[in-house]
Amino acid sequence: MRIVPREKFVDPGFEEFAYEDAPLSIGDGQTISQPFIVALMIEKADLEADDKVLEVGTGSGYASALVSRIARHVYSVERHERLALQARERFERLGYGNIDVRVGDGSKGWAKAAPFDAIIVSAGAPEVPTALKEQLDLGGRLIIPVGRNDEQRLKRITRTGATTFAEEDLGGVLFVPLIGEDAWTAAHPMYTATAPSSRTEETSSKLISAAAEEFSSVDDKSFAVLFDRFADSRIVLLGESTHGTAEFYETRAAISRHFIEHYGFNLIAVEADWPDAAAIDRWLNGQAPGDGQPFRRFPKWMWRNLEFSRFVGWMKKENERRKASHKDPVRFYGLDLYNMSGSIRSVLDYLETISPETAKIARERYGCLSPWQSNPATYGRAVLTEAYRSCEDAVLKQCTELLARSLDDAASGKDDFLNAVQSARLLAAAERYYRVMYYGGAQAWNLRDTYMADTVEHLLDFHGPAAKIIIWAHNSHIGDARYTDMATARDELSLGQLCRQRFDEITSLIGLGTHCGEVIAADDWDGRAEKKQMNPSLPQSCERLCHEAAKPRFLLDLRADEELHASLVEQRLQRFIGVIYRPKTERLSHYMSTSLSRQYDAFIWFDETHALSPLDAPQSSKGDPETFPFGF
């Protein structure tokens, strides 16, 4: 895969997106598969240098090109003439002379060139086509996705005799359909209903409008009462579609206050570093907050902002009231026990002293951690170098030492949750976590969300059966990833998914979204916070449906109306803006396909929103009791 330039097999203008582990459109309803799945299929084909290989579904030609660098000869069949001609031209330009391409029905194989030592099918069939099995040589391997488009399994069929075959299941996958006489017809729903019709969209908007429960302001007492239906849950996850919108913070604060005051919720956990949140928690509970101000690192505006500081001030007063009436306090936690933001800051500072060029690579890679990006728009600047790899051991040592110091501080500060057993567990897994984080990618996301889910579980266990927790995190964390491109295209999971799987009946997932407005975000990781204008949501997106419902603010209960739920099951684009916003590449950088009514239990809508108000850090390095935590 290092030899074949993948960027030569994508459409013009998409070169910078070539190396993200995600599929990319190449036209005619086809995609170039993500590098991981291409590598997996080739690996499972057990290719040898003298093999003759058939690929069904040439597409861009990338897989055939890879196979041609391993095997003696490749035969490739493509249904679309334009793609076949394009692939042939690419092979000629690159000097790959051992590939033959023809236009035809891939489900019938290539009988004249048979038998084959291996056949790789780059499209999903309802069942294994007989013709392909018959064109295998004795001992030949057929790699093919089989099943309906939402339940495909990757199979390896090995010919063991004249009429006998062995079959292995290699796991779940998602491919475009194989069209042909022995496969799907051209009327396959992936082609006929990929984009919802205008009539369907109009119907869905009307259903949203009818089901929408409007509110005038999150400050009205009637607003928080709307969420009483979720108060029986033990875990309530409150999302946001950006990390820089005032209304999202104000909404989560209003719901949290109501649940704390009236329904016994006593834990708040947020998408933040544990040490910073621990300083807030100590201050909320009358303890010395420690040296320094929390949330001083990028992206500091996420928690160092006026809207959140008001909620912190309310929790402080609430705990004072509780102390006076001999009630247990509200506790505040960060879900990132491994101190992700602090660790990244430590990595960048270290790399800056060793090699500024390597530090630039690290910044780009940390900017690509978001799962909704079709590809980091900066791949070329984020490619791994030997210098980057050479810093790995030193970085791991530095991050682990930082974690150990944090745990020591917790012990000296009498942090009852992070006891000796919990600290030992964290340190034992630290090296793996920091190594994965250093290189980024889907594995880093999965590891982080799994640890956050573990933290939620440990908090509930520690605080006892009466404990109830509210979680503040991005929609990409609190939504159920199984019903998004995160799972189908990148094999990623989410905190919301894991909470549902572990605590199904007592978990509520509530997303938040907007059509347009202002947002605080940076251009790149570690960049300057800026007030940016959001583009209006894209046509045929979930957000555009809500916008066309023509109501400025509302709650949408996705469980209450069967017709609404069914209408919003269909996959549509949904926008996700993190700490980085790149409006010029909006579609590729900030949208992915989701099933809204399966992803969340409810959705809170603001048609137009405003940027939150970042607070500048005070000059003093000590926590002043009168101005802590944000010095205003």
Which role fits each region the language model picked out?
Residues 191-632:
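Structured catalytic-domain cores with a bias toward divalent-metal coordination
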Residues 6-9, 141, 175, 235, ...:
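Generic structural signal for secondary-structure transition and capping sites
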Residues 100-102, 168, 333, 510:
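General small-molecule cofactor/ligand-binding pocket signal
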Residues 46-162:
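Conserved nucleotide-cofactor-binding alpha/beta core module
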Residues 36, 114, 131, 247-251, ...:
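Generic recognition of short, well-ordered alpha-helical segments
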Residues 2-70, 83-100, 161-183, 187:
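Class I SAM-dependent transferase core
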Residues 12, 111-114, 131, 155, ...:
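Short, well-ordered secondary-structure micro-motifs
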Residues 154-156, 162-171, 329-334, 613:
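Short, well-ordered strand-loop elements centered on a beta-strand within folded domains, enriched
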